[in-house]
Curated annotation (Swiss-Prot):
Assigned protein family: Belongs to the TRAFAC class translation factor GTPase superfamily. Classic translation factor GTPase family. EF-G/EF-2 subfamily.
Gene name per UniProt: fusA
SUPFAM superfamilies assigned: EF-G C-terminal domain-like, P-loop containing nucleoside triphosphate hydrolases, Ribosomal protein S5 domain 2-like, Translation proteins
Entry-linked InterPro entries: EFG_II (IPR041095), EFG_III (IPR009022), EFG_III/V (IPR035647), EFG_IV (IPR047872), EFG_V (IPR035649), EFG_V-like (IPR000640), EFTu-like_2 (IPR004161), G_TR_CS (IPR031157)
Gene Ontology CC annotation, any one: cytosol
Originating species: Shewanella oneidensis (strain ATCC 700550 / JCM 31522 / CIP 106686 / LMG 19005 / NCIMB 14063 / MR-1)
Binding site for GTP: 17-24, 88-92, 142-145
Xref: HAMAP family: EF_G_EF_2_B
GTP-binding as UniProt keyword: yes
Protein name per its UniProtKB record: Elongation factor G 1
Domain of life: Bacteria
Amino acid sequence: MARTTPIERYRNIGICAHVDAGKTTTTERVLFYTGLSHKIGEVHDGAATTDWMVQEQERGITITSAAVTTFWRGMDAQFTEHRINIIDTPGHVDFTIEVERSLRVLDGAVVVFCGASGVEPQSETVWRQADKYRVPRIVFVNKMDRAGADFERVVKQIRTRLGATCVPIQLNIGAEENFTGVIDLIKMKAINWNEADQGMTFSYEAIPAHLTAKAEEMHEFLVEAAAEASDELMDKYLEEGTLSEEEIKKALRQRTINNEIVLATCGSAFKNKGVQAVLDAVVEFLPAPVDVPPIKGIDDNEQEVERPSDDNAPFAALAFKIATDPFVGTLTFIRVYSGVLESGSGVYNSVKQKRERIGRIVQMHANDRTELKEVRAGDIAAAIGLKEVTTGDTLCDNDHKVILERMEFPEPVITIAVEPKSKADQDKMGIALQKLAAEDPSFRVETDEESSQTLISGMGELHLDIIVDRMRREFGVECNVGKPQVAYRETIRGSVEAEGKFVRQSGGRGQFGHVWLKLEPNEEGAGYEFINAIVGGVVPREFIPAVDKGIQEQMKNGVLAGFPVLDVKVTLFDGSYHDVDSNEMAFKIAGSMGFKKGALEAKPVLLEPCMKVEVTTPENYMGDVVGDLNRRRGLIEGMDDGFGGIKIIHAVVPLSEMFGYATDLRSATQGRASYSMEFLKYTDAPQNIAKAIIESRS
């Protein structure tokens, strides 16, 4: 079966934004104009097509990124048909992992900002993640019809707060209730969309007289930005004072794909203005899979290899999301980087080192699907029938094995105990948690050995609320939820040498293991490092991994209060063995004993997770909010002025002090303030707090 759309006409994009910037409405309009969705789904009716989990429809926020395939021929039918695969990403701070996971498989992104509130804390997080994966992006400043909307102010914030070179390719005509359309700064014409047919048709008009000077100044800025793409263009621009429309577009596209500039558009998705032009910009300025560098991976011989976006290359794909569907079971969303995959064929999971067979392949449209015979380089689809695959695994061809770059997932910072309400719920709860953990790598499940309670950990209170909610709805499991627990950690601040000796003689064969370890603090975030410095075979080579294992097991259980130990460098430098009595078990125990003894002498400290908190509040409540943050041991780092008498407070606060903050903040400010928080780092817990925690756990 030949390819239906050439790969040059593919666009794999994500739509990313802050919680209330209007991203889902924007996606809905995209589906409407591309002819897929006949009735526009409004978020405030709970009818949006991409928000297909029930909780999302209730909360009006997007949690899981559904992948949707659509086609676009241009606002004026000026292009040959392009295939646009859209990954809808969540905007809530507890779900940044979903965003990161989607950005990983995209070639470009549309970042939506609210015209009134501009660059918000979460927008900065998403922007940083897009920078990390070098995703070319364009900006859509939405909600231009809202009170306080100001396109140029948002562009300025993108330049100052996000440090991006932002080049507007449009200018709004009017704002707030007078917002009527936009000026295309490349064509230098005004665009007015027809309200009678929900913006399906439009007309080009002359630029309103009062905006001519402004538009010309911005057009000049845009042409200069285009001219900087190459020396030839710059020479032509300096000689002739202008460039052709085609030259401008080609140059802006090249600079966008190189991540040198970010183009900005504006509109109001809700009022059906501007989204059509964003789709044109996606086609004209964002990359096709062949325009971005080939993905890198590691082959069987630990050598770096590349996989180009080519149907004739060996098959390689990345599983970036697992979802449970009530009708077909597990859906594995994959991005195909190279080669071809046919339904019913076998694939090799190079991370798990297992072979699997793909049952069916489906292309998703928000919540319905079409069956496909095959997928090719550049495609995003869902595979049915894969049992062992988890997020981040690579699927490849058995003869050309490769592991594509693994995704790094953050450690969860909050834990709660859950217990089933009845015996019937108990068995179902295990299955439900197992499935949810397979879908979401930032969610962990474990059993507390002492109390045999089931503990679930995640990125924030909302994250765990939704997990508990999904257990109830999707799996019919009723459970009681305990009080949230903070994920404390331990580390050492001093260096020390310690001996671990395990000897047992009780008739017959004994046990003998003896090691000397040097413990020292490692750099923050560097984790555990084991160095083998044994010379002359005083500890035989085959027992060294056992020493390492013993140390790691002791690290999991801590030395002060039973919390895992972070950032320690351990050097095994001496020891001894017995020809008959030494074995792996004995050295494992010796390693564990040596570490425990050394860590207790190496100035051990308790670490607590600290969160980066941003509170947006009306000015008259600022004193109360700051006072409350100080009482919570918060460190105020700075304040910014928002729009219309709003203050934005930046603080670092220990997580243990933030439980129930949402309710307290609401009552202190009559519901007018909002906050966002994300994990920042671990810091030493104050002595009085550390003492109380250690005593409560001993």
